[in-house]
Amino acid sequence: MKNSKNFSVRKIALGASSTLLATLIAANGMGLANAAETHHHSEHQQTISPNSQKLAKKAQSKMAINNNNYMDQNFDLRKRCFALVGAAEDTHLNYHDNYGSFSGDIGDPRGITAGITGFTTETGDMKPMLDYYHQISPGNPLDQDRDHLKHVSESDLKAHWKDAYDNDTDNFIKAQNHQVKSDDMDVAVKYAKKDHLSQLGQYIYFDALVKHGPGKSNSNNPEDWSFGDLRSRAKAKAKTPAQGGDESTYLNNFVGQRYDSIGKENADNPDMDSDGTFDRLKFQQEELAKEDWDLKLPLDFHMNGKHFILTQDMINGFSDKDLASLN
């Protein structure tokens, strides 16, 4: 739900070495495995020690990452991530409609909430988005609101938001994407690559950034935690794959930190839908338990109490144009 963004800082047939190569496939995709197989055939056959899997994990931190795991280069993954976040934020898979969503004032300290990832009037992400929107579309319907967002009436902002979405759609989507790329997508890609995460891990990071915001508060209060706090606390308990750790163990720790953060916020806000806000985390834990590292479709899940099935046909039907400006 659009209620937790924290901007306190800002907001196998593989030959004799099959065990090793299977591990490399799981960690890095077929490209790395093929490279390892080529190298193997250029050497004499050798016996794999009982510690081969452990050695493969250590080698993983020194080898090239699989760029197919990240939204900056894998467009289909980008569409899957936006659909899943859309289900969590707006209970709607088709992200095109979510650019026009308007949740309003939901009773938290963030003011009025609207847009693809829940821009808010009090946290600092709606204003720069509207400033960029003004740059690319001066005189747009929201120009009259951008300099006094903390005092604008909800009804006026809602009407102007709808006008922008209905009548200046391409520019309005481009402006929202500009902010999402800066605050969420680029940060998710950066740290997912740094930690050598899978496609599933990339999605988990992106969802956390949308929900909790970028930056780091260094607060002991879980309610104040941003993405940087969640990641540092998870790393304190488990090594990332780049450090030679197990991805499932690390990401389960990361999701566990999110449970603590969201749970504390729900406890302090009795009107919050606790079950609904935890659905996104339950889904992530289910995919981790399945070891669905490539986030394969179809995906069958519940979000905000609603049942969804996300298929490849649906992804193919969702707009490519909407997400192109994130390149």
Task: Name what the model sees in each region.
Residues 36-195, 200-327:
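Cell-wall polysaccharide-cleaving catalytic domain and substrate-binding groove, primarily
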Residues 1-16, 31-34, 40-46:
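Bacterial Sec-dependent N-terminal signal peptides
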